[in-house]
């Protein structure tokens, strides 16, 4: 009980400072479990505690800008997992509804093997999870064994183990009762990749993030309530350098998002970023020393790379595509603090200009088709492939590309999926299972027309992310 309250205080303090938070409730007794062999009665289960966190996060604000945010993770084998799936729904007992938290579901290899073998209970829980993702966008799906089986050997020296991810499902760092993860993130603009690929940009960005860790330690050391995060940062100095503008870069080269060419570029670019980031951490290790969890490695940092969603940062970078995901449409309405604005894909616009087809009726057709160019006769088949929208892209190809990228990321990546409303359940299941088989550590939101409509009715931001994940 004390630890649950202590962590809720930590959550509030971190949210107030602009950080997203996440906690794993898998070790809490399920409802009806005896407390101290029944001497103290029976447990009320996890939902009342999650409800407490739900209320606390509502009262916590990230500066003066917006309320705080937290993700609660739960292993699918926990007895209360079916109830956990329902807590964000506006139905049932009010005291068991939690509309302000985000959900993450944890799946082991053993569980997933039983899903593939179509075993009863596991298969039912998995399908219930997918149905909820189609309806609400959540829970995030975390494949915990994919995360832990690729950690370096030197993690094991300190018994470091990953238990859960973060609010945006790209962070994979070790935690325990005395250590809470810290996200230290920034992103490289891949839309400008050709301008910085032969410079020391990656090297300097890695040094910059390490300096941010130093500043955090200096400012946070005397703040009550976040001692576990300070302790974690001191021992790990973990970083998460990522990217944004990936789809914009591909379109600038007239390369389709799906296919071998995009996968080859993924390997080339992220392999290069990893190599240069490794050089930077070894340089800092030799110059400034290694933290406790990196002793004997010569490194300055426990981790180096993680790809965040970067929704707001992508706007600030000139309206490039978010993170590593495809553009949702080639024309869309952007709702920001200054009002509503119609945004057009600049690469498509340049192509239409070159063809003498940058006409109002063309853009009206694209708008009518929800951002799609597939009915624009003046574009060739190859050009239409380049400007496929998120939902038009084969989601299996998106997962395969992410698997290539994951080889170079020591943490993870925020990977959203998008399906048309009439997508067969079998296809949605296949894509999710393939993500696990290919080694992805997690999947973020599932975007569909149904969950966008449902969330609009509840007046809640479906794609919440913390300030750190906008780095």
Each predicted region: which residue ranges?
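Conserved, charged catalytic cores of large soluble enzymes
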Residues: 28, 38-52, 63-160, 243-291, ...
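Internal maturation/activation junctions in enzymes
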Residues: 204-230, 234, 253-310, 381-384, ...
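Hydrophobic/aromatic-rich, well-ordered segments within soluble, folded domains that form packed cores
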Residues: 4-7, 238-256, 427-440
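Glycine-rich phosphate/pyrophosphate-binding loops
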Residues: 17-29, 69-72, 256-259, 415, ...
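Catalytic alpha/beta core of large soluble enzyme barrels
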Residues: 162-163, 168-175, 217-219, 305-471
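Function-dense linear segments that define catalytic or interfacial modules
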Residues: 1-38, 46-49, 60, 133-233, ...
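Secondary-structure capping and boundary motifs in well-ordered enzyme cores
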Residues: 1, 45-49, 73-77, 160-164, ...
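Generic recognition of flexible, low-complexity loop/linker segments
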Residues: 11, 60, 128-131, 172, ...
């Amino acid at each position: 009980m004390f630890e649950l309250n202590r962590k809720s205080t930590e959550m509030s303090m971190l949210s107030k400072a602009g950080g997203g938070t996440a906690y794993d409730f898998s070790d809490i007794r399920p409802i009806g479990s005896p407390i101290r062999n029944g001497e103290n009665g029976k447990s009320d289960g996890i939902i009342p505690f999650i409800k407490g966190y739900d209320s606390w996060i509502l009262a916590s604000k990230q500066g003066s800008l917006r309320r705080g945010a937290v993700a609660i993770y739960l292993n699918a084998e926990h007895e209360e997992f079916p109830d956990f799936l329902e807590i964000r729904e506006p139905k049932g007992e009010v005291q068991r509804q939690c509309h302000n938290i985000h959900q993450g579901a944890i799946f082991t290899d053993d569980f997933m093997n039983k899903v593939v073998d179509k075993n009863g209970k596991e298969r039912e829980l998995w399908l219930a999870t997918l149905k909820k993702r189609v309806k609400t966008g959540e829970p995030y799906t975390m494949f915990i064994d994919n995360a832990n089986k690729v950690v370096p050997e030197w993690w094991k020296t300190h018994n470091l183990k990953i238990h859960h991810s973060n609010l945006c499902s790209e962070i994979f760092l070790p935690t325990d009762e005395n250590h809470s993860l810290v996200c230290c993130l920034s992103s490289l603009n891949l839309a400008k990749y050709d301008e910085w690929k032969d410079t020391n940009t990656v090297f300097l960005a890695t040094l910059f993030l390490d300096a941010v860790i130093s500043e955090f330690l200096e400012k946070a050391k005397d703040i009550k309530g976040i001692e576990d995060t300070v302790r974690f940062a001191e021992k790990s100095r973990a970083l998460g350098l990522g990217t944004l503008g990936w789809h914009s870069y591909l379109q600038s080269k007239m390369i389709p998002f799906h296919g071998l060419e995009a996968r080859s570029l993924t390997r080339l670019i992220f392999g290069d970023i990893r190599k240069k980031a490794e050089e930077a951490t070894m340089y800092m290790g030799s110059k400034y020393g290694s933290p406790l969890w990196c002793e004997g490695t010569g490194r300055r940092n426990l981790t180096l790379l993680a790809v965040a969603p970067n929704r707001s940062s992508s706007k600030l970078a000139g309206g490039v595509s978010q993170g590593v995901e495809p553009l949702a449409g080639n024309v869309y309405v952007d709702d920001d603090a200054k009002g509503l604005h119609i945004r057009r894909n600049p690469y498509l616009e340049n192509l239409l200009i070159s063809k003498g087809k940058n006409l109002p009726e063309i853009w009206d057709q694209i708008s009518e088709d929800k951002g799609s160019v597939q009915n624009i006769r003046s574009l060739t088949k190859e050009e239409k492939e380049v400007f496929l929208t998120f939902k038009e892209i084969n989601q299996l190809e998106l997962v395969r590309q992410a698997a290539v990228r994951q080889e170079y990321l020591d943490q993870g990546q925020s990977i959203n999926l998008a399906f048309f409303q009439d997508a067969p359940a079998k296809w949605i299941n296949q894509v999710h299972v393939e993500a696990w088989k290919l080694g992805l550590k997690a999947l973020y939101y599932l975007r569909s027309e149904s969950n966008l409509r449902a969330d609009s009715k509840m007046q809640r931001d479906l794609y919440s992310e913390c300030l750190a994940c906008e780095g």
